[in-house]
């Protein structure tokens, strides 16, 4: 769901292709767009993935909701965000369909699909998702570009879906609002160092409610009330602690939380910057 002002010249497009944008799998994938490069009308997010072992670039809360849902699904193997649809393919589709190709200052622009997903044990081995606010579907030009995108994936014989804010699970929305309603702590080395002791506590207190345990830890170590929960919140918001996004965070037991065991420090610094 690229925003306005993310246009590129032919030279810039060629450079991005040479850089490997939109290429690779898993931890080696490079998204066509990053949060630094695209103005956003809302919040953008950089979040670590347990599945891919890299930081993902999400341009809205709606993209985040879809990403967290995909991250939780055990059948999902790989998530590639901001996947480019190169003009070498889409230009001919536009001609055949009679739809004007996106052009800025005389240059055919690269369209992008928000997510290309690889799966196992599901109805599809691979599928694509475009994320849009429901209100955007009232715009005729938006619908035209979506039709180009639909035809692109149809030619590839890959199922393509549109996801809007109307489809957001209310519990998922609640969790996102709680995790990201205020600026979370940056992922410093000091904060990351808390993962190991937190993992021990979560294992030891497995059947107890996470909120109650956080209060117990604060009291036991004479910490400011809310300190432990704040650390868990920051680590969870940045993807280093995983939980069932379809269940209210406050209702989770300690055993419901999964702490990342492998963290790429270079990627970690990138999240914090």
Curated annotation (Swiss-Prot):
Effect of residue 144 to A: No effect on recombination
EC number: 3.1.21.-
InterPro entries listed in its UniProt record: Restrct_endonuc-II-like, TnsA_C, TnsA_N, tRNA_endonuc-like_dom_sf, WH-like_DNA-bd_sf, WH_DNA-bd_sf
A molecular-function term among this protein's GO annotations: endonuclease activity
Binding site for Mg(2+) 1: 114
Disulfide bonds: none
Keyword Transport attributed: no
GO biological process, one term: DNA transposition
Catalytic residues as annotated in Swiss-Prot or TrEMBL: 63, 73, 114, 132
Highest taxon above the source species: Bacteria
GO cellular component: chromosome
Binding region for DNA: 90-108
Cofactor(s) it depends on: Mg(2+); Mn(2+)
Binding-site list for Mg(2+) 2: 130-131
SUPFAM superfamilies: Restriction endonuclease-like, Winged helix' DNA-binding domain
Effect caused by changing residue 28 to A: No effect on recombination
EC top class, as a word: hydrolase
Annotated CDD domains: TnsA_endonuclease-like (cd22362)
Keywords: DNA recombination, DNA-binding, Endonuclease, Hydrolase, Magnesium, Manganese, Metal-binding, Nuclease, Plasmid, Transposable element, Transposition
Pfam families hit by this protein: Tn7_Tnp_TnsA_C, Tn7_TnsA-like_N
Cofactor note (record): The active site binds 2 Mg(2+) ions. According to PubMed:10704304, no transposition occurs with Mg(2+).
Effect on the protein of changing residue 114 to A: Prevents 5'-cleavage
Purpose of the protein: Required for Tn7 transposition. Forms the transposase, together with TnsB. TnsA executes the 5'-DNA strand breakage reaction. TnsABC and TnsD promote high-frequency insertion of Tn7 into a specific target site known as att-Tn7 whereas TnsABC and TnsE promote low-frequency insertion into many different sites.
Complex and partners: Heteromer with TnsB. Interacts with TnsC (via C-terminus); this interaction allows TnsA to bind donor DNA.
Protein's name according to its UniProt entry: Transposon Tn7 transposition protein TnsA
Organism: Escherichia coli
